[in-house]
Structures are given as structure tokens and as C-alpha cells.
């Protein structure tokens, strides 16, 4: 007879009964007394489902029968006390411990799972993100460690008190941040420590690693307040001059941006124009170095 904590017990009564064996022939016809020997062997049943403070009581009845079918009985009681089994995180088929994401110009998202087991059936297992670290190219990164850590989330409840296995689901969401500062060949590695804790306070930890790889972002010329891309000049039989600025942005922080005048297209009244295209091209000059490798914005002076 099994009593105590039986929820989670894998063996049926027949299997439990077979775990106790006793001497078949105790007395022969020349003896009045002898010893009956019994032995308990659980075989492949480890009773790991028992948690701390839980126990299983197996009560066996041993019957001695003589040649005249007279009997006597004695109970043998086996008490199995539970101990704490630690939760264990594993990477099973379909699970993943991270992902590599390429910068796309928009928010970055990915998700995955890890498998968790705690053999103590009545224990509850919860998951939290307990630590974070980063490495790689971070010049130009405009998010602090707390904001980067908040980009990964996990489900809190992994295993309830009625199961031994559960799934830890993790989700990475950059919350609109594009990591556009990363240029081609650059990358940022984010490492999240995920810890599962059972009812007894024992833990297991696994890292989830997100690698973000950069891409080349083209520089963009714009006309901001105070800039100008045209000028009207009245000819006055002397050298003519004008100047202005254009704004430039390249979100790849480590890129350098230079400016050159590449073409000219005369239009309007060109009949009688003595200057050829190379001469006209040389009339407009710009600063060569627009953005250094530590900034995202710069100015073209023409």
C-alpha cells in the first residue's frame, strides 16, 4: 500500500509490490525457528518527484504459511523521504540560445525557447534575467545598459506545481532602436544571463546571446534651416561670388564622409558663354572633410 505523497509516482502497485522480495522457504521440517529475510530494491524508479518535506510510505504485508496453511503476517514499512532536485536548463531540439540579427534600418526582433526540468513535482520554477553584458563596437551606441537589458524578456512562470518540465520562452525586441550606428564589418554582442529558480531557492543559469551586425548606411545630404542649395547673382563685369552650406548625416558613426564637386550642368542663356564645363566645374569649391569617424553629422561649405 502506497501512502503519503503519491502525486507524480510513476510506478503502479504491481511494480511497487515487486520492489520487496522475501525468502521463499523459511523453515524446513527439521526446524522450529529461522529468519525470514526481505530486501527492497526500487530498480529504475528513483522517486525523484518527491520534494523536500515530502515522503512516500510503502507498507508491505509479508505472510508466512505452513504446510497446513496456517498463516501469520508482518508488515514491513519503507519510508522514502524527498530531497531537493535542482532545476536544469537544457537546449533541446527546436530550442536556441541566441540569434544573429543584421541591421535593417528599423526595429530588430527575434525569439526562442529553452527547456527546463525540475524532478520535484510540487516545486514551482520561475525565470528572471539576472545579468547583462555587452562587447564589440559600441561607439555611437545611444542606449545604456539598463535599456539594452530591458530589450530581452522571458516568461516568469516556467514550471507549475503539477509538472516536472516546462518551456522558457525568451523574446528580444529593440523597442524601435535600429542600431544604425553600426557600419559594415562592425557588430555588437549582447549577453543576457537567464536564471531559473525553484521553490527551494536552487538555481540554474544559461546565457542567451544576441549578435547585431552592421550594414553600410549611405550619407544623406539635406537642406536644413540656414542651409542653401542655390543663389542668384547679378553680373557686374567683375568676379562673382556666393557661398552657402548643406547638412550631411551618416548614421554609421565610424565612417568618414568627404565631399567633391562631380559635375556641372549649365542651362538658361548659354549662347556666348566663354567658359567650358571644366572651367565652370572649378568655380564651385567645397570642403573635403565633412564628417569624421566619431560623428554622425557634418556640414558642406560651398
Residue ranges: model-predicted function:
Residues 1-18, 88-149, 220-280:
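Extracellular ectodomain surface segments
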Residues 11-80, 138-212, 236-237, 270-302:
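Acidic, turn/loop-rich segments in luminal/extracellular domains of secretory-pathway
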Residues 46-49, 70-72, 85-88, 98, ...:
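Short loop/beta submotifs within extracellular cysteine-rich repeat domains
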Residues 66, 79, 86-89, 104, ...:
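Exported/extracytosolic protein signature
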Residues 78-84, 116, 210-216, 248:
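Interdomain boundary/hinge segments at the C-termini of tandem beta-sandwich modules
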Amino acid at each position: 500500500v502506497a501512502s503519503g505523497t503519491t502525486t507524480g509516482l510513476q510506478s503502479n502497485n504491481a511494480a511497487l509490490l515487486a520492489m520487496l522480495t522475501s525468502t521463499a522457504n523459511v523453515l524446513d521440517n527439521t526446524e522450529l525457528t529461522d529468519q525470514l529475510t526481505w530486501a527492497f530494491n526500487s530498480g529504475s524508479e528513483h522517486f525523484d518527484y518527491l520534494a523536500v518535506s515530502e515522503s512516500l510510505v510503502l507498507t508491505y504485508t509479508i505472510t508466512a504459511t505452513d504446510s497446513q496453511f496456517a498463516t501469520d503476517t508482518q508488515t514491513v514499512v519503507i519510508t522514502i523521504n524527498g530531497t531537493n532536485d535542482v532545476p536544469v536548463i537544457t537546449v533541446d531540439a527546436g530550442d536556441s540560445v541566441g540569434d544573429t540579427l543584421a541591421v535593417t534600418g528599423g526595429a530588430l526582433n527575434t525569439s526562442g525557447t529553452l527547456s527546463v526540468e525540475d524532478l520535484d513535482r510540487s516545486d514551482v520554477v520561475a525565470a528572471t534575467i539576472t545579468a547583462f553584458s555587452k562587447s564589440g563596437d559600441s561607439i555611437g551606441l545611444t542606449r545604456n545598459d539598463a535599456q539594452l537589458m530591458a530589450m530581452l524578456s522571458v516568461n516568469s512562470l516556467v514550471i507549475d506545481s503539477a509538472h516536472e518540465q516546462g518551456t522558457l520562452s525568451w523574446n528580444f525586441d529593440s523597442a524601435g532602436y535600429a542600431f544604425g550606428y553600426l557600419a559594415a564589418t562592425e557588430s555588437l554582442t549582447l549577453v543576457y544571463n537567464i536564471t531559473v529558480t525553484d521553490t527551494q531557492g536552487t538555481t540554474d543559469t544559461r546565457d542567451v546571446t544576441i549578435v547585431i551586425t552592421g550594414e553600410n548606411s549611405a550619407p544623406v545630404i539635406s537642406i536644413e534651416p540656414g542651409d542653401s542649395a542655390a543663389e542668384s547673382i547679378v553680373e557686374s563685369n567683375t568676379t562673382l561670388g556666393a557661398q552657402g552650406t548643406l547638412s550631411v548625416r551618416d548614421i554609421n558613426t565610424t565612417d568618414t564622409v568627404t565631399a567633391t564637386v562631380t559635375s556641372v550642368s549649365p542651362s538658361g542663356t548659354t549662347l556666348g558663354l566663354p567658359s567650358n564645363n571644366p572651367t565652370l566645374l572649378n568655380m564651385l569649391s567645397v570642403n573635403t572633410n565633412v564628417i569624421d569617424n566619431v560623428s554622425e553629422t557634418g556640414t558642406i561649405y560651398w
